[in-house]
A protein has these predicted regions:
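Charge-rich, low-complexity segments
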Residues: 1-70
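Short Gly/Thr-rich strand-loop-strand
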Residues: 103-126
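Short, well-structured hydrophobic secondary-structure segments
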Residues: 72-89
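Short beta-strands and strand-coil junctions in structured, solvent-facing domains, enriched
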Residues: 86, 129-131
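A common structural junction motif
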Residues: 96-102
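A short, structural micro-pattern
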Residues: 71-73, 114-118, 133
Length: 138
């Protein structure tokens, strides 16, 4: 795939990450104004590098023309919480939002991986409005 094609594919993901970082940082500010404490301590986001996308697609046997529909973590938002209970509060907030739709959830806190890894993963569908409307998974 040419570099220009990659830019066209990844631009909506960049936009989604930036929009979601703004939205979640606003939630942090709202909580802090209401009671001085936010269940979200930090908001981070990223779009996978082209080489990481290619590597993951090859490992999973995904054709390059299907990466947008079959690779669910091209973009990601990481919400860091200070306390475990806060994670479930934040998961509830995400479920209640009308601007994103939960596609799947994996609770690696209750169901810890053998390696000891603990986290809570939520894959959401988020509508990005560009000149041509695009739906992406975050």
């Amino acid at each position: 795939m040419e570099l220009q094609m990659w830019k066209e594919i990844l631009t909506p993901y960049d936009l989604a990450v930036e929009e979601l970082k703004v939205k979640f940082n606003h939630i942090v500010k709202e909580y802090q104004q209401m009671n001085g404490y936010s269940p979200i301590e930090q908001v981070l986001g990223r779009v996978k590098s082209i080489s990481s996308i290619i590597d993951k697609a090859q490992k999973k046997g995904i054709d390059m023309d299907k990466i947008e529909t079959q690779l669910e973590d091209i973009a990601g938002i990481r919400l860091i919480c200070q306390f475990t209970e806060d994670i479930y509060t934040v998961a509830g907030l995400i479920r209640e939002r009308s601007d994103m739709q939960v596609k799947s959830e994996k609770d690696y806190i209750t169901h810890r991986k053998k390696s000891g890894y603990r986290s809570y993963h939520i894959i959401v569908l988020y509508k990005v409005e560009t000149l041509s409307l695009i739906h992406i998974s975050e």
